[in-house]
Amino acid sequence: MEAQIDRLFREHPCFSRAAAHWFGRLHLPVAPDCNIKCHYCTRLYDCANENRPGVTSRLLTPGEALQHVRRVLAVEPRIKVIGIAGPGDPLANRATLTTLRLVHEQFPDLIKCISTNGLLLSENLPALQEAGVKAVTVTVNAVSPVVGARIYGYVFYRNRVYRGRAGAELLWRAQYAGIRRAAEMGLAVKVNSVLIPGVNDEHLYQVAVAVRAAGAHLMNVIPLIPRGAFSSLLPPPPGQVARIRQKLTPIIDQMVHCRRCRADAAGMLEEGGA
C-alpha cells in the first residue's frame, strides 16, 4: 500500500510538483451530469477559450475517449495519468466507469484518477479500484452545514433534493466516508477546496483538520474564479492564498502548482498544457 502511494507521489503531476516537470496528464471529458449545485460553477461543453474546471471543447463517449488516449500517447509519451474530472461529476455518470475500464484494459500501467464532489465516492470505490483507479481528488469546501449552505444550492441524492444545511450536512458526511474509505483501501487522496472570500476563507482551517483526520494526503486551496451566483465576488488576492496555504501546511501538505485544469486538459502542467 505504501509503495503504491509512493509511486503516485513520484509520477502524478497533481500530487507532486517535481513530477509535474517530468510527467503529464490527460483528462477525458465523458461526464456531463452533476448531482450538486455549487454557486461558483458554470459548466460549458463547447468552450475552447476558458481555462478552468468545468469546461471542455466537446464531450466524448467512452469509445471516443479510448481513441483519444491512443492519439495523445502517440505524440506525447510523457503522459502518465489518465483522469476524469468532468465537466460534471464523474460519479454521476455511468460513462465514467465504462471509460476507466476500457482504458485500464488497454493501458494498465497508466495511473487512473478521478476528481469528484464525493457524494457517491464511498459506494463506488470497489468498482473504481477494479477499474484501475489509484488516486482520487475530492472537492471539500466546507465541513460546517452553516458554511456549506452558503456554497451549495442543492444536493441531489437517491432521487431526493436536499437544500440548505440538510444538503451541506449530507454532502460532508458522504465526503468524509469516501475519503476515509479511499485512504483505507490504499488510494492516494487529494482534497480541493475553493477559497471563497467572505464565505469560507475563515473556515478552511477546520476543513484541513477534518480532511486530514479522514485520511487525505494532500490539500489544494484553489482561488475562486467568480462565476454563477458568486460572479459578483472578487477573487482572493495571491497574498491571501499564500497565507492560508502557509497556515494549513502544518496540518496537511499543500499543493501549490495547480493550473485549475479544464475537463479536457492534456499535456504537461509545467509547460502550460491546459
Each language-model region and where it sits:
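Short Fe-S-cluster ligation motifs
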Residues: 64-85
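Conserved AdoMet/S-adenosylmethionine-binding subsite of the radical SAM
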Residues: 91-222
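A C-terminal junction/extension of Radical SAM enzymes
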Residues: 186-188, 237-274
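Short, small-residue-enriched loops and turns at beta-alpha junctions
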Residues: 58, 88-92, 196-199, 227-230
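Short pre-active-site segment immediately N-terminal to redox-active cysteine/selenocysteine motifs
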Residues: 33-37, 45
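N-terminal [4Fe-4S]-dependent radical SAM core
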Residues: 1-29, 43-58, 71, 75-78, ...
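Flexible glycine/acidic-rich beta-alpha junction loops that bind and position SAM and/or redox cofactors
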Residues: 146-152, 198-201, 218-239, 261-273
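Short glycine-enriched, charge-decorated loop/helix-capping segments at active-site entrances
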Residues: 52-57, 152-155, 164-165, 233-236
